[in-house]
């Protein structure tokens, strides 16, 4: 019995000592250890427990001014992280959990122009405003999204096209998960355009969107003519949209 008690005490002391070392180990160790191909970290400061990086880059992702703090949230180990991006992206939130990663209380702001620059359009299209994600909770595992409580807004949304500017006011989307797939309920109302619908994306990249689109009184005449060729109008003038396919 005494031997078992001594072993438990010894293990506890080793763990405590390990945590002590981790708490005070300098963050610059991150720049000395082997990293995955293409991953770069620069100007590490603080400790492994609470520190910062001047820059983190991997593949096409680049983050500046990254700060982290290892803590506990609801009795789970948690990583509280904040970052910025040279293109104007800013985010902050918590990643926590034991066996499955849970994203908790995340806020992310991305310039709409940055998002549009990574999309494929037949003609040049620009955008104004920032797309904002407010995520209360999300759980993800190998089979896909298991739970999600989030919403996306785009305050002051405007789209620039060769046919003129399109005022979108503040589009809103509610995000949820269903059987591993991401689901979004979208609603947009402005003097130019009204859009409502529901879309989904599966872990395999299969997407589907069904909704209704109608023009507002202030929509430019050239855009109204283009809209008239989209879908079939109902008695109220709204046109039904149905898209499905697979992401590249």
From Swiss-Prot:
Intrachain S-S bonds: none
Spans through the membrane: 7-27
Entry keyword annotation includes Cell membrane: yes
Membrane topology of this protein: Single-pass type II membrane protein
Periplasmic side: 28-248
GO CC, any one term: type II protein secretion system complex
InterPro entries assigned: T2SS_GspN_CS, T2SS_protein-GspN
Alphabetical keyword list: Cell inner membrane, Cell membrane, Membrane, Protein transport, Signal-anchor, Transmembrane, Transmembrane helix, Transport
Location in the cell: Cell inner membrane
Residues in the Cytoplasmic compartment per record: 1-6
Keyword set includes ATP-binding: no
Location (main, coarse): membrane
GO biological process per UniProt: protein secretion by the type II secretion system
Family that this chain belongs to: Belongs to the GSP N family.
Role noted for this protein: Involved in a type II secretion system (T2SS, formerly general secretion pathway, GSP) for the export of proteins. Required for the translocation of the multiple pectic enzymes.
Protein name according to UniProt: Type II secretion system protein N
Underlying gene: outN
């Amino acid at each position: 019995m005494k031997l078992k008690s001594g072993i438990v005490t010894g293990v506890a002391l080793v763990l405590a000592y390990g945590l002590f070392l981790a708490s005070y180990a300098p963050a610059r160790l991150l720049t000395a250890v082997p990293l995955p191909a293409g991953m770069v970290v620069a100007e590490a400061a603080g400790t492994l427990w609470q520190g910062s990086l001047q820059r983190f880059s991997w593949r096409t992702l680049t983050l500046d001014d990254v700060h982290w703090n290892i803590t506990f949230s609801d009795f789970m180990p948690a990583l509280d992280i904040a970052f910025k991006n040279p293109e104007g992206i800013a985010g902050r939130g918590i990643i926590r959990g034991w066996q499955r990663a849970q994203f908790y209380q995340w806020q992310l702001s991305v310039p709409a122009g940055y998002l549009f620059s990574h999309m494929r359009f037949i003609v040049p299209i620009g955008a104004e405003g920032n797309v904002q994600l407010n995520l209360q909770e999300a759980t993800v595992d190998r089979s896909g999204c298991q739970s999600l409580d989030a919403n996306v807004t785009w305050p002051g949304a405007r789209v620039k096209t060769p046919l003129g500017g399109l005022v979108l006011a503040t589009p809103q989307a509610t995000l949820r998960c269903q059987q591993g797939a991401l689901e979004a309920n979208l609603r947009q109302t402005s003097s130019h355009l009204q859009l409502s619908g529901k879309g989904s994306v599966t872990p395999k990249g299969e997407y589907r969107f069904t909704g209704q689109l109608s023009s507002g009184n202030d929509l430019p005449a050239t855009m109204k003519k283009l809209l008239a060729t989209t879908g079939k109008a109902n008695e109220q003038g709204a046109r039904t949209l149905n898209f499905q396919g697979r992401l590249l």
